Amino acid sequence: MNISFSKSAIDDLKSIKEHYLAQGLPQIGQDFIVAIIEHIETLAAHPSIGRVVPEFNDDSIRELIHSPFRVVYLRESESINIIRV
């Protein structure tokens, strides 16, 4: 299954990295980004692993929790679109 990232999701990942860089913790920021992306990659084999986002109550809009972050994605028949992090 193909996984794509919206511009908003890419911007979110950049913001996470910049936040930790500004705190003087660039390696922690980089480690978080790598771990989040690895978690997202599990969706290719298990697209329904995330729970339905309560605010939307739509089975196709799901979330993975990667504490303290939430990855919101759209599950479609042939692809997954990462909406926000």
Predicted features and spans:
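Basic, Lys/Arg-enriched alpha-helical interface segments
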Residues: 2-60
